[in-house]
């Protein structure tokens, strides 16, 4: 996809999103209670925060509510947070609402982790369909484990491998060659994938990955295509191995006590405004996935190209991925899940859509 096409697509979905946000609900009534929300977004240097999360809370919400609803919204980067702690802080009432990645907050609920098991789905439309089918399970788990109201689900560009192989002229590098490599991960399920290919998982927060790759703490890293570009991974790695392991299932949740304190008009106002924002998120993810791959490699790109060597998965890689998913990812997750109900719910939703099956 050419960069001009990407720009046109971006303008189109932004215009649709802005229009939807304008017409989704009428203006707030004079009786709506004035209040400010304490909000944490995702990473401050990435696209979702800069173009959607931040502008929604700091600009759109006040404008669309006639100044009744405002927010003190900051990215987790600005607050010095890693993302792993945000749901526990939300439960404590430190914040009113948080954006986050499901696998970052699945410590207390393997069922939440089930939304984004590594390697199960390799295309975004199917991934979204699966997450929608699983939404009610996520909503229940957020309420029961974290006293939180799930308000939105979205995703990031596909999670792929980025490795420093030392020589950019290398054009063939299969999953079978990852054995013995130290690979950055951010979730247990990605760690299961790494174990399946014979690598060593190294858990590193996103903001700390570039120095870790630079110093050899990790040989490779897993993240989204555009996040890797925006974080300048191309300065410290040589190759992008384009095996898709998921799309970093993400969410917006509000403290349940705070949500329940809102009157019906305010709750409905939020629902009406967040629905089109969620559509914007998914549309942006589709565009940014390709943009990230292009910019990390040889372009086209509207900024500096990363000059990584791109390696597409072979038929043998796809066979190996299937085996790793079945024998490591699903088996280990089912064991963490621990109950037949948990496994059955996944099989009836994401499993049914993906054609995969988990078993205790």
Place the predicted regions along the sequence by residue:
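Secondary-structure junction/capping motif
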Residues: 4-6, 47-48, 133
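N-terminal secretory/targeting leader peptides
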Residues: 11, 15-17, 30-125, 149-360
């Amino acid at each position: 996809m050419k960069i001009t096409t990407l720009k046109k697509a971006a303008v189109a979905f932004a215009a649709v999103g802005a229009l939807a946000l304008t017409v989704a609900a009428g203006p707030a009534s004079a009786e709506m209670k004035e209040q400010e929300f304490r909000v944490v977004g995702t990473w401050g240097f990435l696209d979702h925060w800069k173009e959607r999360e931040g502008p929604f809370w700091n600009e759109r919400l006040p404008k669309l509510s006639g100044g009744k609803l405002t927010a003190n919204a900051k990215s987790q980067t600005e607050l010095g947070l890693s993302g792993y702690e945000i749901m526990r802080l939300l439960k404590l009432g430190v914040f009113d609402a948080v954006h986050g990645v499901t696998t970052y907050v699945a410590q207390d609920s393997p069922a939440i982790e089930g939304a984004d098991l590594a390697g199960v789905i390799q295309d975004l439309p199917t991934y979204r369909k699966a997450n929608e089918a699983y939404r009610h399970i996520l909503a229940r788990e957020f309420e029961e484990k974290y006293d939180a109201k799930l308000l939105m689900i979205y995703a990031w560009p596909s999670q792929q491998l980025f490795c420093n192989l030392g020589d950019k002229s290398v054009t063939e590098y299969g999953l079978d060659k990852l054995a013995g490599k130290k690979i950055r991960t951010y979730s247990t399920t990605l760690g299961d994938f790494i174990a399946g290919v014979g690598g060593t998982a190294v858990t590193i927060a996103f903001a700390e990955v570039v120095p870790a790759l630079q110093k050899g703490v990790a040989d490779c890293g897993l993240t989204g295509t555009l996040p890797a570009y925006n974080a300048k991974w191309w300065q410290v790695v040589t190759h992008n191995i384009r095996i898709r392991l998921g799309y970093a299932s993400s969410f917006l949740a509000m403290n349940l006590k705070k949500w329940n304190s809102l009157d019906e008009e305010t709750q409905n106002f939020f629902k009406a405004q967040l629905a089109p924002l969620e559509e914007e998120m998914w549309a942006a993810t589709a565009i940014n996935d390709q943009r990230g791959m292009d910019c990390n490699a040889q372009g086209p790109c509207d900024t500096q190209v990363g000059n990584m060597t791109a390696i597409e998965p072979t038929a043998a890689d796809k066979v190996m991925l299937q085996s790793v998913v079945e024998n490591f990812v699903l088996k280990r997750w089912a064991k963490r899940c621990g109950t037949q109900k948990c496994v059955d719910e996944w099989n009836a939703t994401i499993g049914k859509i993906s054609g995969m099956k988990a078993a205790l």
